A protein has these predicted regions:
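Short hydrophobic/aromatic beta-strand micro-patches
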Residues: 9, 53-56
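Short S/T/G/P-rich N-terminal loop/turn motif that feeds into the first structured element of a domain
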Residues: 1-49, 61-64, 84-117
Length: 117
């Protein structure tokens, strides 16, 4: 399995509602995405920091999603609204507690070489 994490820091508080709305729309459609196994989201710092952790069958499934028209539109529409850091790693099994713990280590700077806000 392949895990991908997005750590997005929104520049202006006025952009928080539109970023949150789009994130909820995305989450509702998640079961329809080929190769997507899991998605967890978190909102921190009063909503300014949005984190998503997604689990995929393979890196190729993630690449196909990243190249999809819907994802490309979202990246274009929100490019200037915040700063995005991404990281990825392999997971042996779909274990929510373990994967979230690995994500937390990255978010808190406990994994060398992984940028975070």
């Amino acid at each position: 399995m392949h895990v991908s994490m997005n750590d997005y820091l929104i520049h202006r508080r006025s952009d928080i509602p539109r970023v949150a709305r789009e994130g909820l729309r995305f989450r509702r459609r998640w079961p329809e995405i080929e190769g997507a196994l899991g998605l967890w989201v978190a909102s921190l710092n009063g909503g300014r920091r949005q984190v998503s952790v997604s689990v995929w069958r393979s890196p190729e499934d993630l690449r196909r999603f990243v190249r999809s028209p819907r994802h490309l539109r979202i990246m274009r529409d929100f490019r200037s609204a915040g700063a995005l850091y991404t990281s990825a790693w392999a997971a042996e099994r779909l274990d929510r507690a373990l994967i979230w713990s690995q994500a937390t280590d990255r978010l808190q700077g406990r994994v060398d070489g992984v940028p975070h806000h």
